[in-house]
Every structure is written in C-alpha cells, then in structure tokens.
C-alpha cells in the first residue's frame, strides 16, 4: 500500500489516460474518473477509454514533420497512448492511423489492470477540494455541471468552437470499378481508397452540399457558432467557394488510377486526370470499414446518406456511422495556466488535453504526459518540470501558457496544433525546408535527452509495433 497521496484524474480520454498511467508508473496511486457510460457525451459511442470520436489518424509518422516529431518525443518519454497506437496501427501511407476499437479496448484493459489505478464511473460535477492533487482532463466535451463550476473557479467564460466527425462506411459497399486504391504521390503502400470526380460531378456534388439540410444547433449556440479552421465541416468548405474543396480534402494532385493509362504520357495525363478526388482511409487493418477523409459534417443523417452517395463509387455505400457535430470547450489557458500546466491560482490543480487549447490527438497525449508527470512529482514532494521550448511538447505547453501568444483577429485565444512555427529559430538559417525541419528535429531530440538527464526521467524509447 503506497504512503503517497492519491492523485485524482478527471476524464479518461487521451490526455487523462496518459496522465493516469504516468502517475501510476511513478508509484503514486490514482483515482481515474470517467462519466461514460453513466452519462454519455454528444459525440461518444462507447464506454472505452481514449475513444477517438473524430478521425482515426494521429497524423504524420515522419519525425521531420511536426506531428511526427511530437510522437517521437512521446515514444522516448514512455507514452502508453503512443505505444498502444503503434501496436494497433492500420495502413495509412505516411500517417499513424489506428483501429479505433481495438486501440481503445487495449488502453482500457491495461489501465484497468494497473494495481495503482482505481477506476470510478460517474460524473464529476465540481472541482475537488483544495487539498486534492487533481488533473483536469475532461476534454472539449466537459459536462455542463463541471464546466459551470470551472467558470466559477476561473472567473472566466470558457471559449468554444464546433467540431465534427466524419462518416464511416463498409468497405464491401465501395464500387471498385469506379474507385481505386493509391496513396498520394505513391508514398508507401496503396492505403487509401480514392473516388475520382469529373468537373460536372464535382459541381453537382457541391450544389447538393449547399442545399442539404443541416442538423439543428441549440438555440444558444446559433449566434456564436464558429469552427476550428483545421477541422471544418465539408458543407462549410463548400460554402467558402467553388474550388475550396478541390484545394482541400478533395484535391486530386498526386493521385492516379493505372486504369487511366500511362501517367508519364502528357496527353493521357491531361485528358484523364480527375477534377477532384474523395479519399477514404481504413478504420481497421483488413479494410472492412473506411472513413471519408476530411468529411466532417453537420448534415442530417438522411441528407448525408443522400448526398454522399453521389460520390462515384459510393452509390451503394452502407453507413455504419454518420458524421456528427459537437461543441468543443476549452479554457483561455494563457490567462490561467503555468508552463507546467498547473493553474496559477491553485498549484495542485493541473489541466491537460484539448481543454487547454491544444489541437489534435497527439497534442492531447503530450499534455497528459506533462500534467501526469507533474502531478506525480507534487505527490512525491518534488519540483514540477517543464520541457524546453525547443522540443515540440515544450513549445505547445509554452504556447498555451503564454499570455502574449497568438490570437485571432478578434483578439481571442484559439487552439493550435503542433507546428514548426512554434519552435524558436535555429541558430543558422537553413533555406531548404526538409533540411530545416530535420534540424528542428535533431535539436528537439537532443534537448529532450538533456532534459531527461536533468530531471532524472528514465529514457524509454518505444519500438513501433511493440505491445
């Protein structure tokens, strides 16, 4: 029986799962509270931990990409979520995509079996007392009662935007006489299903999107409805201009069906090249289920079925999940948090994940790792830590705790995904982009290793595919 105080983690999403694991692995007991299935959120379907409600992709794998560097840092820090994602990966070209069902089930099983983690299934309606070390990892779908209590505690109204999830269809219902398998620019294996459109099909599809009936927003949301630019509903993209979708998720560049002829023949290429292409990505290794890439939507389910069947190759599509839209809540973190992810006004309360204003699955995991590590250190009477801003984890946590950080044109704090623009400039200017990103990576991993040595953190690189 541990003599250390028990840490409370509220929320068993990506950030909360990571935080709970890091705390327990440090030898500190944890109470992990998850309200599902006692109370479901508007977007979740199961009671499993770390359920992925939007895409099944964690983004780029290559460490010379910002999202890939973030994952590599987390592997070296012993992240359970990234380890599990690697173990449940499905083919996705240069991205880390997972079988979302087996991924969540595996995490739930491992966390539930840990001797220092106690699972509690109920809604946490308020913040615990001041003596309790707590990690708040309730995510963008924080329950209203807790959100109201948080507003009272911070003295601020929370920020929000609207997020949406893409539909999923059965692979057997895709017409392979019209669709073809390929990865963009032939990178990796042919891991994506591609549905090409000519100009007439594209314009008719866009017109159908513009005229389709949307699901009704709650009255209090209608006037303040705004979207995160990195995850716009497909109908919102259609509204922004005739070619917006073609330069976004439906871009045809780098995709070629061998049945069209010789790609190297200029005349064939000009006459056969698709005007737009809808891509689908595997949900599972066998390809039984596929999600429509970039097709977040708030259309009514009946309208999704009608409009999306206009896509060539999907005229007989069988839907296993329709797209949904939900309100995402996040804190005005730069006014509330320290770079350690502790609240400025209460040092034993920490926040992690998308509620802090980071964007993306891997960034949520990174916040969970840091908040969990610091909660464990508080329980052990040690100083809390930060990671250097030259690392991607450090850059993200400094971003959400910097009162001078980037704001939109209205002066409002907005979520930010991992990107190299967050990192300090290199000592020497490198003009070639690939070499520059490689230099950012090399510096980040060197600084991470130095930080691990400074703070006595064990080096824990994780082999991809290990369990």
From Swiss-Prot:
GO terms for cellular component: cytosol. One of its GO terms (biological process) is tRNA methylation. Its cofactor is FAD. It catalyses: uridine(54) in tRNA + (6R)-5,10-methylene-5,6,7,8-tetrahydrofolate + NADH + H(+) = 5-methyluridine(54) in tRNA + (6S)-5,6,7,8-tetrahydrofolate + NAD(+); uridine(54) in tRNA + (6R)-5,10-methylene-5,6,7,8-tetrahydrofolate + NADPH + H(+) = 5-methyluridine(54) in tRNA + (6S)-5,6,7,8-tetrahydrofolate + NADP(+). InterPro entries: FAD/NAD-bd_sf, MnmG-rel, MnmG_N, TrmFO. It holds the Pfam family GIDA. Its main location: cytoplasm. Disulfide bonds: none annotated. It is an enzyme of class 2 (transferase). Keywords: Cytoplasm, FAD, Flavoprotein, Methyltransferase, NAD, NADP, Transferase, tRNA processing. It comes from the Bacteria. SUPFAM superfamilies: FAD/NAD(P)-binding domain (SSF51905). Catalyzes the folate-dependent formation of 5-methyl-uridine at position 54 (M-5-U54) in all tRNAs. This is Methylenetetrahydrofolate--tRNA-(uracil-5-)-methyltransferase TrmFO. It comes from Prochlorococcus marinus (strain MIT 9303). The lineage of its organism: Bacteria, Bacillati, Cyanobacteriota, Cyanophyceae, Synechococcales.
